Amino acid sequence: MRTRLQSPITLLLVLGLVLAACASSSPSPSAGASSGASAGPSGAAADLHGQTVTVIGTWTDTEETAFRAMVKPWETQTGATVKYQGTRAINDILAAGIPTGVLPDLAGLPGPAQMQEYVTAGALKPLDGVLDVATYTSETASGLTDLGKVNGKTYGVFIKGAVKGLIWYSPTLHDYSSAPPATWDDLVRQLKANQGNAKALWCLGIESGAASGWPATDWIENILVRQAGPQVYNDWWAGKVKWTDPAIKAAFTTYMNDVVANTFGGGTTAVATAFANGGDPLFKSPPGCAAFQQASFITGLGAFKDKKAGTDYNAFPFPSFNSQYATAVEGAGDLFGMFHDTAAAKSLIAYLVTAPAQDIWVKIGGALSANKNAADYPDAISKTMGGMLANAGILVFDASDQMPTDMNAAFWSHMVSLTSGKETIDAALTALQKIADTAYKK
């Protein structure tokens, strides 16, 4: 997911990045692919003492702690230092840095669409000579590797993954673990039958600061790919299917009629509730809702704090609408790219795609590995999710993250207006198509 902050905050963050870049080590001698690939826990590390790699990503708080734990073995073995800055203003910082050249060595990229923009601008460095691309491709979840390519060259690699559209619930209300609902109609029927004293069928929180609305876009995406299939889904985010198309309207209608209309507190509560706290009413007495839809990474953001996986909470995959697309999974991930090809930067990014590196974050929790060989999951739920990502029959990537920046921002904004009841479906789709008419031409 991508976020934007107001300009005064952004300027301060950009200033911090400038200082970080100035404080980094002087350009080091170029290193070949072997020095990067060997700099990991399981191989002989290159000697990079005194060198610094500047990195920015969206991770703060517990996620930042996990990332720092992930890079610690590399720092210990190479002698280099990772200077990390966590911010939700990735878009703004990189957009400001492209023209000036004031950029970090490595960065978590906002999404595949922005990665292509950075490549076109000549800012991102290709990774084909930095890591063994064949090995990376064979070890990475199918469907992700091509998202990091532009004109056949690899510019972005995934160091962490996520499954979106999981249905979270409390087994104390009803345990779905032995036979989760397979279809949407079955899900709605079972939620109603097992609702008990819960006040509503669904919990929903879509507030996320300047990025408010993105959790609602996930609802649309998960519904659409299962109703209309991956071809329509991919053509839609690419601007080839109009927002006013009947298939798109059907997904929006399902969201409004089946979800928002049956949400705890209604749409006005949903737009005011932080997404990480959206599922909190599951555990109230009486429960506020019977189910909550969110991605696998929600457990790493403080959701279900002090709750035990499998006992206090559980999850199952988003059910199907059309049996033809029953194996569809919406995935997401953290795409990393390199702006400065120093020896230390090349070594670090080659390390980050390995299973030993990704196992560190996986074991901490709240993350799925993009590497299929990582398996150190902390609980059965996380392990199942990891298998979903690695073995999906139909894997599509988060649609909004692949849209042009203006389109993505408008999608978020109109989902807030729609959910809160300030806008009708037809009005929202017409407005979004008007933006699409220009956004895809830039």
Locate predicted features.
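Conserved C-terminal helix/tail region of periplasmic/extracytoplasmic solute-binding proteins
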Residues: 52, 389-442
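Short, solvent-exposed loop/beta-turn-alpha elements that line the ligand-binding surface or hinge
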Residues: 47, 128-140, 179, 206-210, ...
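Extracytoplasmic/periplasmic solute-binding protein
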Residues: 155-159, 188-241
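Glycine-centered hinge/linker elements that transmit conformational signals in sensory
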Residues: 237-272
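Conserved N-terminal structural module of periplasmic/extracytoplasmic solute-binding proteins
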Residues: 22-116, 121, 133-136, 344, ...
